[in-house]
From Swiss-Prot:
Domain of life of the source: Bacteria
CC annotations in GO: cytosolic large ribosomal subunit
Function: This protein binds specifically to 23S rRNA; its binding is stimulated by other ribosomal proteins, e.g. L4, L17, and L20. It is important during the early stages of 50S assembly. It makes multiple contacts with different domains of the 23S rRNA in the assembled 50S subunit and ribosome. The globular domain of the protein is located near the polypeptide exit tunnel on the outside of the subunit, while an extended beta-hairpin is found that lines the wall of the exit tunnel in the center of the 70S ribosome.
NCBIfam families tied to this protein: rplV_bact
Family matches, as HAMAP family: Ribosomal_uL22_B (MF_01331_B)
GO biological process: translation
Keywords: Ribonucleoprotein, Ribosomal protein, RNA-binding, rRNA-binding
Family the UniProt entry places it in: Belongs to the universal ribosomal protein uL22 family.
Gene from which the chain derives: rplV
PANTHER family: CHLOROPLAST 50S RIBOSOMAL PROTEIN L22-RELATED (PTHR13501), LARGE RIBOSOMAL SUBUNIT PROTEIN UL22M (PTHR13501:SF8)
The protein's name in its UniProt record: Large ribosomal subunit protein uL22
């Protein structure tokens, strides 16, 4: 077992975006380099792209500051959005009825890994 750490992660918890919408954005950047992923997310029209970009940038910063990895060689090896707690609210409807609204939240996790310059 070597002590050579080549990956770092970041997690944003309780993000107020539904997991299904967050996964749609995460699928755009999984397997890409960090620089490429951030440029894709910058111009993605989905609202979930902003919190995902923050997590990607945080994972890259963690890799650089905590483990001394070169940010230009980082690739997103894992990215997923798990379901967080759901807030339940009621929408008043006609004739005294009420419909339930589920305000979903996500836990977004990104793992970046250092790749060799020639590999890809």
């Amino acid at each position: 077992m070597s002590d050579n750490i080549t990956s770092a992660s970041a997690t944003a918890r309780f993000v107020r975006v539904s997991p299904m919408k967050a996964r749609r954005v995460i699928d755009l950047v999984r397997g890409k380099t960090v620089v490429e992923a951030l440029s894709i997310l910058k111009y993605a029209p989905q609202a979930a792209s902003e919190p995902v970009a923050k997590v990607v940038a945080s994972a890259a910063a963690n890799a650089e500051n905590n483990f001394g990895l070169d940010p230009r060689t980082l690739v997103i090896s894992e990215a997923y959005a798990n379901e967080g707690p759901t807030m339940k609210r009621f929408q008043p409807r006609a004739q005294g009825r009420a419909f339930q609204i589920r305000k979903r939240s996500s836990h977004i996790t990104v793992v970046v890994e250092s790749q060799k310059e020639g590999a890809n």
